[in-house]
């Protein structure tokens, strides 16, 4: 601990930005989720530390009284310790950790807090590791460049640590191979501790030995570290890991051999053989992936002891390639090498760490057409530090120009956010894409509000993207830190006063990707600070008050500059700065403000804030001391001279460029003499050829020149004005095959007219450029390592065997993938349209060919002809599509916890019993209904056979469990809902909590069937009349002609089906509408029936029946459809019951206004109608209907009783709840949550709301979702039967209905890429 304390005073209050190993593998370019997780952890740690400080620094004067002070302290303590997620032991550990950090020396406290320790043990480990590293003896190191040994004390003395840093980095630059055209400035670590720790982490080597092409990477040390890290990785994994120990590896080989030898195999043997196989390689048994016949590629399994050697050799063979290249090479040959193992190895590879620490992701500026086209909108939560009624900050940034706007908000309601955005849009214009890290729902609501306020505005919600220079989370946290810093400095809580200055500071930094600041990018000019940006002195500016005085001051300044310029001309002094000032025509020149007037200064290298004490001697830019290189030609007495790394790199590249130019052979003088004859316009090109050896320096110099911000940095541009636009000209030649290449396993083949190498082991044909020993050897060692040690005679024998065998086609010629995908895309609509399969070839294909031949030509028609669309092909495609949809459905159900079923059976055209089953489950923040499966029952439809069909599919095929089935809905048939052996009863034995529901629509139809004798006689008479006319074709034609002559609205009567009782409503309505036409027609045919239409009492009963049946038809239609819930159905039934009760009361007062047809008859006939008898008949019928509805829909079984909180949890009444006391308390808490209330009002469906509330209130949401998952009717099964009757007709009675039925009824989109990747395309037969 003392050694640690001795080092930390050197920090001088500066905390390093990075601790531990300074060189890490950068995976930001390949996997952004790592950065997001680390940013989230930093945000949580910062929030907890801030809460702790606020708790400790809380003052009694900040509150109006003692009760408020105590309440505020409790809230701050809760925010710090988080008792909701921490146990008592964890809270105690946090208190001990705080006290432990307090007793540490001040130098150690800041360093330890940077590591965000979670417990005291982590602090002890950090301090012990640091003490151990600082107490280790310094070893002697050898410098390969100078051939002499230098100790660590001699190489990095304490007095000149920073001075030696520049010299060592210069020597490192001389040895490094340039790998990127972009400059890589030194890291701003701000202390000698960083330099010391970096030296130790590199094992004591000199910094100049940082060579990315170094071959020695200490494999033995890497091996030991790799296996230790691998052991820790496997401890955190489950038993189902892909990495095998050697014992497990040998055991698997033994089990696979035993399984293959068994004559009668068990299920476990089949599963094992489906994954593994064993082959013999050079006398050793190897475990490989089972070959399924679709591919002949062999992929090996590795055990843990061979893992490091494979990774190490592959990494060296690809020249220290990154994770993507290693993954591509390894996974092509090995089955169980994962990304985690590859990344584990890469973190131990020193050259990769050194290389990636210098490489940066290239930042590219967006084109001008994307300005104000995409914006980032986020909300900064300031509820813990409100400024009056303002509790949030709107952070708006244009992702192209990086222009930032900040607005204070009172709430986070979408309406207020939209008004603040409109204020910004009226300044810079509205974007096309709006993205936000506050969630898709928030963005959608804001876009919707913007559209309501400004209808012409069209903005879409974009996918989340990070900014090029800094992520939105980091920017938000940076703004929050600036606000808290200002509040503490000024001892004020009114942060809205400083918000405008924060906005300006965000728009002032220089962005290297854009080569300018956000203000300059957006407005083509730097942000002005009045006359503070002028060339006038401060005293003169302070004395100016009018524009006339300003004009006079400008004239005097111009005269002064001109006099100085003329004086410099006479004396021969450099006057470039004065020339620039004289060439400025505006009255206020474009010049950077003095350092004394800048509110925020930034380093020109790292773009971070700096004090402005140090400046570059070349470009006069503000820099950190660590970001510069000490000048070697500084004069005595002038102090230490510093050059920024950008200028230093520019001068270094220029020096190397000049040295190489001087080393080139001298060309003849006539080639150097410029010609006086210009080229003709047709011979002038837009590029010129340069020597290949100079291209790097030309591009490097051009890249550095783009970062300059003054004319002094561009001093060399005049000599090479167009070098940045030059192109490298590669020599084009064909490599020849050498017979010695056979020892690498390659022979020569002719591909077209080019000679190419072909591997005799795997048959891969490489490019002609790969015909050289290094690349051929790389292929051999990376893909065929097991035979890499074989002698030359082995490969010659393999070559002879290959030539003696029939010619094998290794590389399959181009296959018509487009034709294969086209066949799938045609098969899908054929199945959706429920048409015969032959239509694809006989109609669709011929029509497409004719259209292509007419519009695109014969070549396009020939391509269409290649698409396979025969009858059998379409059948196979539909089967594959159905299987893929089924696999996706099963995966989605397994992801959801609960599901419910809807089942029914019917008889098809071939007298086969078809069982249809639908499923409802949670998916994508909503409840989804899908066709589950269909099954054919060849014999009886007993409950046992139905149950076995359901169980075999759900349990055996899908691997689901019935205990997660929360409900089963059927039509009430005996085989479904009998008292003893029904399907539902057997399912409830496996799932006791499963609820059974009888179809609401079916029960409503049953309730309508009870009718009085008088009304039933009217129905019978109507049926006879309809059958008399419709059964005789002559009567039907004569009646149609009569209706036409009488100009009736309808010309035909309608038939009804007895099984569909409510279909009589349309028959009765049609009969009532053309009653006069029927009276005329029946007078000559059936006079007895014509008397019925003359009887006003019979006609009144007909009118009533047509009215009441039409009303219940409407009710029946409203109960049909998808995504209906148990509660919506119960609401409609209860509403109809209350209507019947009200109608009954109105009838007693002779009010018939609710029956329109009956009211028409009463108004027509007047007193001829026996109104008393009619009142009795209707009242009796309405009473029977109420009794039937109460029988089929008992009030005591109303699902809403005790569950009304599910429909609206924010109701004031919380009585008669089917909840425990604990859940009732949670419901009361939910009802007062304003955020959820807003979400409830804006959510489209009730299930979506409860799914969103599941994170905060899981118990309540689970109860609600179980009831919302229940099917209220068998509507989906009925629509499925209709589809079944269309697909399987008497002409297609032998069709296997299951595959086309799934494709026609399912809403899941098939994965065509996956289907086509498993098949080999071929032309149509």
UniProtKB/Swiss-Prot annotation:
Residues 246-275, 542-568 form a coiled coil. SMART domains: SCAN. It is found in: Nucleus. InterPro entries: Integrase_cat-core, RNaseH-like_sf, RNaseH_sf, SCAN_dom, SCAN_sf. GO terms for cellular component: cytoplasm; nucleus. Pfam families: SCAN, Znf_SCAND3. The keyword Coiled coil applies. Residues 366-526 form the Integrase catalytic domain. Keywords: Coiled coil, Nucleus. Signal peptide: none annotated. Weakly expressed in the lung (at protein level). GO terms for molecular function: nucleic acid binding. Residues 52-134 form the SCAN box domain. GO terms for biological process: DNA integration; positive regulation of cell cycle; positive regulation of epithelial cell proliferation. Highly expressed in non-small-cell lung carcinoma (NSCLC) tissue, with increased expression correlating with advanced disease, lymph node metastases and poor prognosis, as such may be a candidate prognostic marker. May act as an oncogene and promote tumor growth via positive regulation of cell cycle progression at G1/S phase transition. May promote invasion and metastasis via activation of the AKT/GSK-3 beta signaling pathway. Expressed in the cytoplasm in NSCLC tissue. May be derived from an ancient transposon that has lost its ability to translocate. PANTHER family: EPM2A-INTERACTING PROTEIN 1, LOW QUALITY PROTEIN: ZINC FINGER BED DOMAIN-CONTAINING PROTEIN 5-LIKE. This is SCAN domain-containing protein 3. It comes from Homo sapiens (Human).
């Amino acid at each position: 601990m003392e050694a640690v304390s001795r080092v930390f005073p050197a920090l001088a209050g500066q905390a390093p930005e990075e601790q531990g190993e300074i060189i890490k593998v950068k995976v930001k370019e390949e996997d952004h989720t790592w950065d997001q997780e680390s940013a989230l952890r930093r945000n949580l740690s910062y929030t907890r530390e801030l809460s702790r400080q606020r708790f400790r620094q809380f003052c009694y004067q900040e509150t109006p009284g003692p009760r408020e002070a105590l309440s505020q302290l409790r809230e701050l303590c809760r925010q710090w310790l988080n008792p909701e997620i921490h146990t008592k032991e964890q809270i105690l550990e946090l208190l001990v950790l705080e006290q432990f950090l307090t007793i540490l020396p001040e130098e150690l406290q800041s360093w330890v807090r940077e590591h965000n320790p979670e417990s005291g043990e982590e602090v002890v480990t950090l301090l012990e590791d640091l003490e151990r590293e600082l107490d280790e003896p310094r070893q002697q190191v050898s410098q390969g460049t100078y051939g002499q040994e230098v100790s660590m004390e001699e190489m990095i003395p304490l007095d000149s640590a920073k001075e030696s840093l520049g010299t060592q980095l210069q020597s490192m630059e001389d040895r490094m191979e340039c790998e990127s055209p972009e400059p890589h400035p030194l890291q701003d670590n701000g202390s000698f501790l960083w330099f010391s720790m970096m030296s130790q982490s590199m094992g004591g080597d000199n910094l100049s030995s940082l060579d990315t092409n170094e071959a020695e990477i200490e494999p033995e040390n890497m091996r030991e570290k790799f296996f230790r890290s691998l052991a820790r990785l496997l401890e955190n994994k489950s038993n189902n890991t892909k990495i095998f120990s050697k014992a497990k590896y040998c055991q698997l080989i033994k089990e696979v051999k035993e399984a293959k030898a068994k004559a009668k195999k068990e299920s476990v043997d089949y599963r094992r053989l489906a994954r593994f196989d064993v082959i013999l390689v050079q006398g050793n048994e190897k475990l490989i992936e089972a070959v399924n016949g679709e591919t002949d590629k062999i992929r090996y399994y590795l055990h843990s002891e061979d893992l490091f050697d494979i990774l190490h050799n592959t990494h060296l063979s690809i020249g220290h390639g990154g994770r993507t290249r290693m993954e591509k090479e390894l996974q092509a040959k090995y089955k169980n090498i994962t990304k985690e193992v590859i990344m584990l190895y890469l973190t131990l590879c020193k050259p990769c760490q050194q290389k990636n620490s210098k490489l940066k992701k290239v930042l590219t500026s967006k084109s001008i057409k994307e300005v104000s086209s995409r914006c980032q909108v986020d909300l900064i939560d300031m509820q813990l530090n409100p400024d009056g009624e303002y509790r949030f900050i709107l952070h708006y940034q244009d992702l192209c120009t990086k222009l930032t706007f900040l607005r204070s908000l009172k709430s986070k309601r979408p309406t207020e956010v939209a008004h603040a955005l409109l204020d910004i849009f009226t300044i810079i214009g509205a974007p096309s894409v709006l993205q936000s890290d506050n969630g898709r729902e928030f963005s959608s609501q804001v876009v919707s509000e913007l559209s309501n306020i400004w209808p012409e505005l069209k903005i879409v919600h974009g996918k989340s993207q990070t900014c090029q220079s800094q992520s939105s989370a980091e920017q938000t946290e940076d703004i929050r830190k600036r606000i808290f810093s200002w509040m503490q400095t000024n001892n004020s809580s009114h942060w809205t006063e400083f918000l405008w200055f924060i906005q300006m500071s965000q728009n002032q930094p220089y962005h290297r990707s854009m080569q300018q600041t956000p203000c300059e990018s957006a407005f083509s000019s730097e942000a002005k600070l009045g006359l503070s940006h002028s060339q006038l002195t401060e005293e003169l500016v302070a004395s100016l008050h009018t524009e006339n005085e300003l004009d006079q001051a400008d004239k005097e300044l111009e005269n002064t500059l001109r006099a100085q310029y003329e004086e410099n001309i006479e004396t021969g002094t450099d006057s470039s700065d004065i020339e620039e000032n004289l060439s400025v025509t505006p009255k206020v020149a474009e010049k950077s403000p003095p350092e004394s007037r800048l509110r925020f200064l930034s380093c020109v290298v790292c773009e971070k804030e700096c004090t402005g004490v140090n400046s570059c001697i070349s470009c006069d830019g503000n820099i950190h001391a660590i970001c510069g290189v000490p000048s070697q030609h500084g004069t005595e007495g002038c102090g230490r001279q510093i050059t920024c790394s950008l200028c230093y790199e520019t001068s270094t590249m220029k020096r190397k460029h000049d040295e190489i130019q001087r080393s080139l052979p001298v060309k003849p003088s006539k080639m150097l003499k410029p010609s006086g004859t210009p080229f003709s316009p047709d011979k002038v090109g837009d590029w010129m050829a340069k020597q290949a050896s100079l291209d790097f320096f030309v591009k490097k110099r051009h890249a550095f020149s783009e970062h300059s911000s003054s004319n002094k940095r561009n001093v060399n541009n005049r000599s090479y004005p167009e070098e940045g636009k030059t192109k490298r000209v590669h020599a084009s030649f064909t490599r020849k095959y050498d017979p010695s290449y056979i020892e690498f396993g390659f022979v020569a083949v002719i591909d077209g007219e080019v000679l190419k190498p072909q591997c005799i082991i795997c048959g891969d044909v490489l490019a002609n450029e790969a015909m050289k020993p290094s690349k051929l050897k790389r292929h051999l060692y990376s893909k065929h390592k097991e035979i890499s040690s074989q002698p030359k005679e082995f490969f010659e024998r393999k070559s002879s065997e290959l030539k003696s065998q029939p010619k094998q086609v290794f590389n399959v010629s181009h296959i018509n993938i487009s034709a294969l995908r086209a066949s799938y895309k045609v098969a899908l609509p054929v199945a959706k349209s429920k048409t015969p399969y032959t239509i694809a070839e006989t109609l669709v294909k011929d029509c497409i060919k004719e259209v292509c031949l007419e519009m695109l030509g014969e070549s396009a028609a020939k391509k269409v002809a290649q698409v396979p669309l025969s009858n059998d092909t379409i059948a196979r495609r539909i089967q594959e599509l159905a299987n893929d949809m089924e696999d996706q459905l099963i995966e989605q159900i397994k992801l959801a916890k609960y599901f419910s079923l809807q089942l029914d059976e019917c008889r098809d055209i071939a007298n086969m019993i078809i069982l249809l089953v639908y499923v409802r489950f949670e998916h994508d923040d909503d409840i989804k209904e899908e066709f589950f499966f269909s099954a054919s029952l060849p014999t009886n439809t007993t409950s046992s056979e139905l149950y076995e069909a359901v169980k075999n599919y759900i349990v055996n095929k899908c691997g689901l469990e019935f205990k997660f089935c929360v409900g089963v809905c059927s039509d009430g048939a005996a085989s479904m809902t009998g008292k003893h052996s029904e399907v539902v009863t057997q399912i409830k034995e496996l799932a006791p909590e499963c609820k059974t529901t009888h179809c609401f629509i079916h029960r409503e139809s049953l309730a309508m069937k009870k009718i009085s004798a008088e009304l039933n006689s009217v129905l019978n008479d109507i049926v006879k009349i309809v059958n008399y006319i419709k059964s005789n074709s002559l009567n039907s034609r004569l009646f149609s002609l009569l209706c036409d002559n009488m100009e009736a609205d309808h010309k035909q009567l309608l038939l009804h089906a007895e099984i569909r009782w409510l279909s009589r409503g349309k028959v009765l309505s049609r009969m009532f509408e053309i009653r006069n036409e029927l009276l005329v027609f029946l007078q000559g045919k059936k006079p007895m029936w014509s008397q019925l239409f003359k009887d006003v009492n019979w006609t009144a009963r007909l009118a009533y029946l047509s009215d009441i049946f039409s009303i219940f038809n409407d009710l029946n239609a409203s109960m049909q459809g998808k995504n209906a819930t148990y509660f919506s159905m119960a609401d409609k039934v209860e509403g109809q019951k209350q209507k019947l009760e009200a109608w009954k009361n109105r009838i007693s007062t002779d009010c018939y206004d609710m029956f329109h047809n009956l009211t028409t008859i009463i108004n027509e006939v007047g007193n001829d109608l026996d109104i008393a008898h009619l009142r009795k008949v209707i009242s009796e019928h309405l009473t029977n209907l109420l009794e039937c509805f109460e029988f089929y829909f008992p009030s005591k079984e109303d699902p809403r009783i005790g569950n009304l909180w599910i429909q609206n949890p924010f109701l004031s009444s919380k009585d008669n709840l089917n909840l425990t006391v604990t859940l009732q308390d949670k419901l009361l808490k939910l009802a007062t949550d304003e955020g959820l209330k807003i979400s409830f009002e804006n959510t489209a469906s009730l299930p979506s709301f409860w799914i969103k509330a599941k994170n905060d209130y899981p118990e309540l949401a689970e109860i609600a979702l179980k009831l919302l998952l229940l099917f209220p009717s068998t509507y989906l099964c009925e629509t499925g039967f209709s589809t079944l009757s269309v697909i399987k007709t008497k002409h297609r009675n032998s069709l296997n209905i299951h595959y086309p039925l799934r494709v026609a009824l399912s809403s899941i989109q098939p994965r065509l890429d996956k289907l086509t990747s498993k098949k080999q395309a071929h032309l149509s037969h």
